[in-house]
Design a protein with these regions (language model features):
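Blade-level signature of beta-propeller repeat domains, shared across WD40, Kelch, NHL, RCC1
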Residues: 162, 171-188, 192-212
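Short, conserved, GDST-rich strand-edge loop motifs in beta-rich repeat architectures
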Residues: 96-114, 159-175
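A short beta-strand motif characteristic of beta-propeller blades
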Residues: 14-21, 65-75, 132-138, 194-198
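Short loop/turn segments immediately following beta-strands, especially the blade-tip
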Residues: 3-11, 52-62, 121-129, 182-192
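Beta-rich, blade/repeat-based domains predominating
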Residues: 21-38, 70-91, 100, 142-153, ...
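A detector of repeated loop/turn-to-beta-strand junctions in beta-rich toroidal repeat architectures
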Residues: 13, 46-48, 61, 114-118, ...
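Short loop/turn segments immediately following the C-termini of beta-strands
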Residues: 44-45, 54, 90, 99-101, ...
Length: 212
């Protein structure tokens, strides 16, 4: 992971972080806490959130906390990966999206075993910066590659990026189209399903989603 200084419209290299020489550290996305001292990293293939500290002088190369983003052990035939990570405008919560793939050679039309396509919600300790998993909620689709939180902190929208055939918790095969899933965000940071906007028959992918 590379860090750069930004000044007068120009970037200059500051530091590089590769815990354990980069082994087991597949950083995909990160977000800076509003206090400017904490960084939260989505570590893709490990399905983890990592927490480290930063100050005006240096970036800590010690990962202070590692926490799984999953609600259960990975199921047979499933490969899990995280994607986006965003901190709530209040600074009290951090959200990470989980994606489930087939662990074999997946081709369009094949059925993906039941896995976790969901948003993980973590509560941030205001004193220490450490996180605690408080919720995993399904996005009602497949491969939520990206999501956004509106500036008021009351809504979260997730983009289920690809159509898929997937087994549900009952073992039934269901067809999941490309879709946008809207959640309400409660005062406790937890998400509540609000609306799902699907695009059946679409062969395009939803890579990004945001609020205007």
């Amino acid at each position: 992971m590379k860090f750069f200084n930004y000044r007068d419209g120009k970037l200059s290299f500051q530091d590089s972080i590769a815990p354990n020489h980069g082994i087991g550290f597949g950083a995909r996305h990160l977000d800076f806490h509003q206090n400017g001292n904490w960084i939260y990293i989505a570590v893709e293939r490990q399905s983890e959130i990592h927490f480290l500290r930063i100050d005006e002088k240096a970036i800590s190369k010690t990962i202070e906390q590692k926490a799984s983003t999953l609600s259960q052990s990975i199921q047979p035939g499933v490969r899990q990966a995280v994607s986006a990570i965003h901190i709530h405008p209040s600074g009290d919560f951090v959200y990470v999206s989980n994606r489930a793939y087939s662990s074999g050679n997946y081709a369009s039309g094949n059925t993906i075993p039941n896995g976790e396509d969901n948003i993980a919600t973590f509560k941030i300790d205001k004193e220490t910066g450490r996180v605690n998993l408080i919720q995993n909620i399904d996005t009602n689709g497949s491969l939520p590659r990206t999501f956004s939180i509106d500036p008021s902190g009351r809504l979260l929208i997730a983009a289920n990026s690809e159509p898929a055939s997937k087994k549900n918790e009952l073992g039934q095969v269901v067809q999941l189209p490309v879709s946008l899933n809207l959640f309400k965000i409660g005062d406790d940071g937890k998400l509540e399903q609000s609306e799902n906007l699907s695009f059946p028959g679409e062969d395009q992918l939803l890579f990004w989603a945001g609020f205007l």
